[in-house]
């Protein structure tokens, strides 16, 4: 018998969105990827780093990602000591649990949101407590003083779409005895963010990713912004060469090209609003979204039926079997052409 830890043997593990092998033949709207390529400056930086013969790849990358921390600090208005780079924001989420929640201690998060928080907690042997949402998009039953070691809040919420108001998040930070982690994966698509709370509260951490708005999901680049003492703790336990040379070069170029980022986000927001209106015109219930996706429910509330119909037409969206979500689908925002084709497919399915 293989001597697995009991918590590992009994856990289910996280199931990511499906990546079809023949991806070019699909309209892929299931994992909130950006429909536009990364900045041309990113491609240029990667080629320059690679060089004519790839010799640079034989040398380890910067272990500290110091240049990235400096560029991110300039962009967000923080000293580099407040920033840590990561192999996708998932690495930071994992290390936050490792740093702050011992076996048997509690972490919490909103359900529905990113269920991977629970998976990471299970690996650590931490206890998981989930909280629902009220009709006015507040956390149901959240205590006046939450004693869990880490509480994760995805804002904008995924898969639903709305953001939590800044003043409400500020209140949550005061009510959390442990760390409040604001997962701002989709912040660049939203009207506001909560970065200012990092300065206001010593227990607030904001995580960001370059996977969505910067079109770099294939390179796995993330970061966290927090007080220097929190960053120093995370730095102790991260993988020491966690970002490869090409990813570091790409990240610097992407963060510096804010004009390109702004234009991509503008186009996605514009398409999101158009698609919201079109879905409602055919009877769908659509939650107003601040992300690059919509959660939409068909008139008969049978999300699986519509998902299957789209799948048969090679349009891939995300359906969740969770009873709280099974009535609808999360649909990533693609190009205008992709969304027009998706709308036509939905009208065919009925």
Curated annotation (Swiss-Prot):
One of its GO terms (molecular function) is histidinol-phosphate transaminase activity. Keywords: Amino-acid biosynthesis, Aminotransferase, Histidine biosynthesis, Pyridoxal phosphate, Transferase. Its cofactor is pyridoxal 5'-phosphate. Transmembrane segments: none annotated. It catalyses: L-histidinol phosphate + 2-oxoglutarate = 3-(imidazol-4-yl)-2-oxopropyl phosphate + L-glutamate. GO terms for biological process: L-histidine biosynthetic process. InterPro entries: Aminotrans_II_pyridoxalP_BS (IPR001917), Aminotransferase_I/II_large (IPR004839), HisP_aminotrans (IPR005861), PyrdxlP-dep_Trfase (IPR015424), PyrdxlP-dep_Trfase_major (IPR015421), PyrdxlP-dep_Trfase_small (IPR015422). Its EC number is 2.6.1.9. It holds the Pfam family Aminotran_1_2. Pathway: Amino-acid biosynthesis; L-histidine biosynthesis; L-histidine from 5-phospho-alpha-D-ribose 1-diphosphate: step 7/9. The modification N6-(pyridoxal phosphate)lysine is found at residue 212. Belongs to the class-II pyridoxal-phosphate-dependent aminotransferase family. Histidinol-phosphate aminotransferase subfamily. Homodimer. This is Histidinol-phosphate aminotransferase. The gene is hisC.
């Amino acid at each position: 018998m293989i001597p697995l830890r009991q918590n590992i043997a009994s856990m289910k593990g996280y199931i990511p969105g499906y990546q079809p092998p023949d991806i070019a033949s699909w309209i892929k709207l299931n994992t909130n990827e950006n429909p536009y390529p990364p900045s041309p400056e990113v491609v240029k930086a990667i080629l320059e780093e690679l060089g004519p013969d790839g010799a640079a790849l034989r040398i380890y990358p910067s272990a500290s990602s110091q240049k990235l921390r400096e560029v991110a600090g300039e962009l967000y208005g923080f000293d580099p000591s407040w920033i840590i780079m990561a192999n996708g924001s998932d690495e930071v989420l994992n290390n936050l649990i490792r740093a702050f929640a011992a076996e048997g201690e509690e972490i919490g998060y909103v359900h529905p949101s990113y269920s991977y928080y629970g998976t990471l907690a299970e690996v650590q042997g931490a206890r998981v407590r989930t909280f629902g949402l009220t009709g006015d998009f507040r956390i149901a039953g959240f205590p006046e003083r939450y004693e869990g070691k880490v509480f994760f809040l995805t804002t904008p919420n995924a898969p639903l779409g709305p953001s939590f108001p800044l003043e409400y998040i500020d209140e949550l930070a005061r009510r959390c005895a442990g760390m409040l982690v604001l997962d701002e994966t989709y912040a660049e698509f939203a009207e506001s963010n909560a970065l200012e709370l990092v300065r206001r509260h010593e227990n607030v951490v904001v995580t960001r990713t370059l996977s969505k708005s910067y079109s770099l999901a294939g390179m796995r680049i993330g970061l966290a912004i927090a007080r220097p003492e929190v960053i120093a703790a995370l730095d102790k336990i991260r993988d020491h060469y966690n970002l490869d040379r090409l990813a570091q070069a790409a990240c610097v170029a992407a963060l510096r090209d804010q004009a390109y980022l702004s234009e991509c986000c503008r186009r996605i927001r514009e398409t999101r609003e158009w698609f919201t209106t079109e879905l409602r015109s055919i009877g769908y219930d659509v939650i107003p979204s601040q992300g690059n996706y919509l959660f939409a429910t068909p008139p008969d509330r049978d999300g699986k039926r519509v998902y299957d119909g789209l799948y048969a037409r090679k349009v891939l969206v995300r359906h969740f079997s969770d009873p709280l979500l099974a009535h609808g689908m999360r649909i990533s925002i693609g190009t205008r052409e992709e969304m027009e084709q998706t709308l036509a497919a939905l009208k065919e399915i009925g």
